[in-house]
Curated annotation (Swiss-Prot):
Recorded family membership: Belongs to the cornifelin family.
UniProt xrefs under Pfam families: PLAC8
Source domain of life: Eukaryota
Source organism (scientific name): Xenopus laevis (African clawed frog)
Database matches in InterPro entries: PLAC_motif_containing
Protein name: Cornifelin homolog A
Length: 111
C-alpha cells in the first residue's frame, strides 16, 4: 500500500555573489585617449575591426550586421561588467562611435 506524498522536497536556496564591476571609463569619456577618439570619430569601421581583433575575434566580424553588439556583450561578460544586452543595444544604437571608443579603452586597459 502506498502512502500519498504530503511534503515535497525543498530546493536549496543559495545566494550567488557576483564580482561585477563597472566599465573603466564612461561612454562619453572619449577624450581620455585621443587616438581612440579620433579613430572612433573619423573611421569607426576601422575601430570596430580593431576592437573585434583585440577581443580575440576575426577583424572582419564587424562586417556582419549586429556582430558588434555581440562583441560588446562578450566584453561585459568576460570582465563581469554590469549591464544587459538591452543596454548594450541602446548604447550602440544611439551612441555608436562613443560606445566603440569605450570598448576600445576597456580592452586596452584590461589587456
Amino acid at each position: 500500500m502506498s502512502y500519498p506524498i504530503s511534503a515535497q522536497p525543498q530546493g536549496v536556496q543559495g545566494y550567488m555573489t557576483s564580482n561585477s564591476s563597472q566599465w573603466n571609463s564612461d561612454v562619453f569619456d572619449c577624450c581620455e585617449d585621443m587616438g581612440v577618439c579620433l579613430c572612433g570619430t573619423f573611421v569607426p569601421c576601422i575601430l570596430a575591426c580593431k576592437v573585434s581583433q583585440d577581443f580575440g575575434e576575426c577583424c572582419c566580424l564587424p562586417c556582419l550586421f549586429g556582430s558588434i553588439l555581440a562583441v560588446r556583450t562578450g566584453i561585459r561578460e568576460r570582465y563581469h561588467i554590469e549591464g544587459s544586452i538591452c543596454k548594450d543595444w541602446v548604447c550602440l544604437s544611439f551612441c555608436g562611435p562613443c560606445a566603440l571608443c569605450q570598448m576600445a579603452r576597456e580592452l586596452k586597459t584590461r589587456n
